[in-house]
Amino acid sequence: EDYATILLGDCSDCSKMKELYKDFTYDKVLVLGLGLGLIPETLKVEKSCSVVDVIDNNQELIDYVNFIDDSINIIKHDAFTYTPDKKYDFILVDLWWGNEDITDEMLSNLENNYKNYLEDNGKMLIPILYKSFEK
C-alpha cells in the first residue's frame, strides 16, 4: 500500500499520482509548495529525479511532512521572494490556487523571478483551478 493511501485514506486521485507522471522526463525539479509531499515524493522515488527542491514557508507543514525521502531538499522560504541557486529542467508551481486567488501581478512576479533559473528547453507549469463547485 502506498503512503498516499495510508496518509489520506481512500483517495483515488492521490493514488493516480504514478499515472499522472508516467511520461515525466525531467531530472532537476523545483516545486513551489509542499502540500502533503505527494508530488515531490513521486518525482524523487518513482521518477528518479536527481534534484527535487521544494519551497514552502509553512514550518508546521514542513514538520508534518517528515516522511518524504531524505534527499528531497525542503527550503523554508516564501515562493514569491526565493532566489534559486541553480537552474532546473522543470518548475512546478503547486500553490493550490483558484482563479480568484491569483492576480496577473502574482503570475508575472513568479515568471520574472524564476524564468532565469530554467535550463534551456526547461518548463514552468502554473496550474490554476478555473472552476469549482459548491453544494
Write out the residue ranges for each language-model feature.
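Short amphipathic alpha-helical segments and helix-helix/interface helices
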Residues: 18-22, 40, 62, 80, ...
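Conserved acidic residues
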Residues: 27, 50, 89
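S-adenosyl-L-methionine
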Residues: 58-85, 90, 95-99
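Class I S-adenosylmethionine
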Residues: 1-28, 37, 41
